[in-house]
Each structure stands twice: as C-alpha cells, then as structure tokens.
Swiss-Prot record:
Contains disulfide bonds. Residues 34-148 form the C-type lectin domain. It is found in: Secreted. This is Snaclec 4. Residues 1-23 form the signal peptide. The keyword Transit peptide does not apply.
C-alpha cells in the first residue's frame, strides 16, 4: 500500500500517494485521483495539531498535505473549493520545531516554493488564479480565496 498524505481544513481533505502507479490511479470509492495520489475531503473541525494527528491515524504514513508543483496546487484548490466554497484549511507546511526552517509534516522536500513571503503570511498563487494564504504562526490556517 502507498503512503498517505492529508490536507486538513479546519475541515479536512485527505490525500494519499499510491507509489509505483502511473496514470491509472485506482482510488477507493468517494476519493478523487490525480498524479498517483488520491484525495478526499473530510468535514471535521479541529486545530492543526489535531488535524495532523487525525491524518496519521488514518493510514500508515499519512500526514497533512504537501504540495510539490502548481498543477497539484490547482487540483487541491479545486477540490477544496468544490467542497467548502469558502473556508479554512490546514496543510502540512510548518515551522513548529525548526525555528525558521519550513518543512512538510510528511518529511517531503520543500521543492515547491511558489509563494511570496510577507510580514505575516505566505501567499501561494495557483495557475487558476486562486490564492492560498498562510499565517506564520504555527497554528494559523491556510485560507482560500479568489483574487478580487
């Protein structure tokens, strides 16, 4: 079985990776596949630490979501917007223990850096012109919004 990766919203989106498969990802019922990954939204309210814990308890190797390219970010944003319309989500990017060394909770390399660092937030812009912002406090949430 592949590794599982999660996105939590204050509500929750779950992602898992099916290693060794190519274009034809066979996801469980109720899940959506994209590039060797399966995605599912869970509408559960929780803080960041509880969301990460929830994710790790779902499947071996599961964590809050990590993003690695703009296409994956677009896919995730579309899934989130279709479920939440407008909402707050948790992701695995954190600096909880690293003192300014940002990393993903699943240990993946921080290879997608399409953000602008401002005084108090990160802003990811996807190809579809969605914005994903992240406050720099460890327990702040990602917010999704369309640019005005």
């Amino acid at each position: 079985m592949g590794r599982f990766i999660f996105v939590s919203f204050s509500l929750l989106v779950v992602f898992f990776s099916l290693s060794g498969t190519e274009a034809g990802v066979c996801c469980p019922l109720g899940w959506s596949g994209y590039d060797q990954n399966c995605y599912k939204a869970f509408e559960e309210l929780m803080n960041w630490a509880d969301a990460e814990k929830f994710c790790t308890q779902q499947h071996k190797g599961s964590h809050l979501v990590s993003l690695h390219n703009i296409a994956e970010a677009d896919f995730v944003v579309k899934k989130i917007v279709s479920v939440l319309k407008d909402g707050v989500i948790w992701m695995g990017l954190n600096d909880v223990w690293n003192e300014c060394n940002w990393g993903w909770t699943d240990g993946a390399q921080l290879d997608y850096k399409a953000w602008n660092v401002e005084s108090n937030c990160f802003i990811f812009k996807t190809a579809e012109n969605h914005l994903v912002t992240y406050g720099l406090q460890w327990d702040t949430q990602f917010r999704l919004q369309e640019p005005g």
